[in-house]
């Protein structure tokens, strides 16, 4: 998906460098009639690496980098001199990048840590020079090894946002507003569906200089698991979150029904998502008088037995401290 500078999916072709060939040079020196072999080895071809970079949050910088090629190894020289190694290429990617084989769709590896470095195309080994092939029966071998060929790969890079908490809800549930009051993030906010067309991340400052990361996942609609709307482009970002915050507005026609639809979309996309911790948050509680809120709590106790829920108002700044406390406790249950 692409929106502005946010790109979370791209395809690139990578090629390492081929190894340099070994030399067949024979030693030549004044007054020495028959010099022995002194051909050096070829240099290694350049590798292509993927490197995790925490300051990146998009694959936009690779949008037009369709072909990344490392340098070839240099040929061996005389006096057993080894050829130069080919130039390595480093492709920086954001944390949470999944690397797939384009043809088979097999996951090759994932980049999840800053500075993590993985070879995606290994440079060819340099060939051996003729010096290695001298023997008692062949004092002047005139052959050497060629360098090994380069490796090529068509790969798919797919970004899955790394966050502790994922905000899940229908379009216009108030997720962007909640993110803006909990964090310093400034997501686009307006009163129409699909205001958010990319995941927005924010850092929630907690007590004693602690913090956690929360992601506003673009609004899910019924049928998202089958690709309706923007489908799996949104849903895959939720896979990384350890805790899911289901945000449902207090003025929803049926809070339980909205929650069930959201949960069913996650289940159909990936049943393992149901193993994550869940918190139901009823937003816009400033619209409720005290009596109505009491009645609603009674109904929620029946509908969501065993699942924690909270009432908040982002606009009125109600229940936000309790929300932070609850999320922190859920994220640090084993601490």
UniProtKB/Swiss-Prot annotation:
GTP binds at residues 169-176, 194-198, 216-219, 283-286, 313-315. Its cofactor is Mg(2+). The keyword RNA-binding does not apply. Gene3D superfamilies: GTP1/OBG domain, P-loop containing nucleotide triphosphate hydrolases. It is found in: Cytoplasm. Mg(2+) binds at residues 176, 196. Coiled coil: none annotated. The keyword Magnesium applies. Keywords: Cytoplasm, GTP-binding, Hydrolase, Magnesium, Metal-binding, Nucleotide-binding. Residues 163-332 form the OBG-type G domain. GO terms for molecular function: GTP binding; GTPase activity; magnesium ion binding. Residues 4-162 form the Obg domain. Its main location: cytoplasm. CDD domains: Obg. One of its GO terms (cellular component) is cytoplasm. PROSITE patterns: G_OBG (PS51710), GTP1_OBG (PS00905), OBG (PS51883). GO terms for biological process: ribosome biogenesis. Its EC number is 3.6.5.-. NCBIfam families: Obg_CgtA, PRK12297.1, PRK12299.1. PANTHER family: DEVELOPMENTALLY REGULATED GTP-BINDING PROTEIN-RELATED, MITOCHONDRIAL RIBOSOME-ASSOCIATED GTPASE 2. An essential GTPase which binds GTP, GDP and possibly (p)ppGpp with moderate affinity, with high nucleotide exchange rates and a fairly low GTP hydrolysis rate. Plays a role in control of the cell cycle, stress response, ribosome biogenesis and in those bacteria that undergo differentiation, in morphogenesis control. Belongs to the TRAFAC class OBG-HflX-like GTPase superfamily. OBG GTPase family. Monomer. This is GTPase Obg. It comes from Flavobacterium psychrophilum (strain ATCC 49511 / DSM 21280 / CIP 103535 / JIP02/86). The lineage of its organism: Bacteria, Pseudomonadati, Bacteroidota, Flavobacteriia, Flavobacteriales. The gene is obg.
